[in-house]
Amino acid sequence: MSELDQLRQEAEQLKNQIRDARKACADATLSXITTNIDPVGRIQMRTRRTLRGHLAKIYAMHWGTDSRLLVSASQDGKLIIWDSYTTNKVHAIPLRSSWVMTCAYAPSGNYVACGGLDNICSIYNLKTREGNVRVSRELAGHTGYLSCCRFLNDNQIVTSSEDTTCALWDIETGQQTTTFTGHTGDVMSLSLAPDTRLFVSGACDASAKLWDVREGMCRQTFTGHESDINAICFFPNGNAFATGSDDATCRLFDLRADQELMTYSHDNIICGITSVSFSKSGRLLLAGYDDFNCNVWDALKADRAGVLAGHDNRVSCLGVTDDGMAVATGSWDSFLKIWN
């Protein structure tokens, strides 16, 4: 037996030990504890706005912290900043590469970022003296496509990539200050904790990992999905997070319990999940699916509480505003819809 086989066997044994230890700690289930809580009832949301302007599939969107402006990225090679109240376009930014897969709005509202198959995270300054939008930095260093990016502040951004790593960048210098390694498949999505000291990532190795931004360490690894994790989102209090996967389930993982608490699935749902987001309270989990719908789940009871149907193609991205008053969905049908 080769040394490699021995190590593989050892790793399997350790994994089983961890699984048993987690089982021993699981003295209760979330569904048992929440039996006395009233169900949320039927959630019916209406389309309040449709944002028309992109000419091709929308791949990503992100709300600004003002809960009014949002940025969207499409394969028409444009980044559009929208005013969701009026549906006006505040900026339409032509991109150097049209193969964009992610976009992000800085908390300050001064910058937006995007990236994709060019392996570069491009930072755009929205508040230049001349009033035009221009590239302020191009962050190159990943050796695979950029799948997700999120600003910590105006000078720091975290990115995830197909090259199996995440990275923290100093935007001023254009350098990676920390590289987060440990995944064994494309990293598809990341989500910052409310205090921005931690972030979680979901990958094609079917695992989610919790990282310490400052130390560059992987704190915890969460398994359970049976296929690629496409989407990940922190619970509003920062103690848990949800994932969406190609295995047609969403799952809730708890950082303190170090394990999965809940699975959100239905026999009728057989397609993958592209995006997940929590309501402001965390009671509702919204998930976008390949079957053109967005399902609303009762996060505590795992019941389907509603569905947002209105797109004519895959729902590729969604986001809830910081004030919790609206949700936006973006789709391959080239439209964004605002619901509440």
Swiss-Prot record:
WD repeat ranges, renumbered to this chain: 46-94, 95-140, 141-181, 182-223, 224-267, 268-309, 310-340
Alphabetical list of InterPro entries matching this protein: G-protein_beta_WD-40_rep (IPR020472), Gprotein_B (IPR001632), Guanine_nucleotide-bd_bsu (IPR016346), WD40/YVTN_repeat-like_dom_sf (IPR015943), WD40_repeat_CS (IPR019775), WD40_repeat_dom_sf (IPR036322), WD40_rpt (IPR001680)
Record PTM N-acetylserine, positions in chain: S2
Keyword tags: Acetylation, Phosphoprotein, Repeat, Transducer, WD repeat
Subunit structure comment from the entry: G proteins are composed of 3 units, alpha, beta and gamma. The heterodimer formed by GNB1 and GNG2 interacts with ARHGEF5. The heterodimer formed by GNB1 and GNG2 interacts with GRK2. Forms a complex with GNAO1 and GNG3. Interacts with ARHGEF18 and RASD2. Forms complexes with TAS2R14 and G-proteins; these complexes play a role in the perception of bitterness. Component of the TAS2R14-GNAI1 complex, consisting of TAS2R14, GNAI1, GNB1 and GNG2. Component of the TAS2R14-GNAT3 complex, consisting of TAS2R14, GNAT3, GNB1 and GNG2.
Function in brief: Guanine nucleotide-binding proteins (G proteins) are involved as a modulator or transducer in various transmembrane signaling systems. The beta and gamma chains are required for the GTPase activity, for replacement of GDP by GTP, and for G protein-effector interaction.
Name the UniProt record assigns to this protein: Guanine nucleotide-binding protein G(I)/G(S)/G(T) subunit beta-1
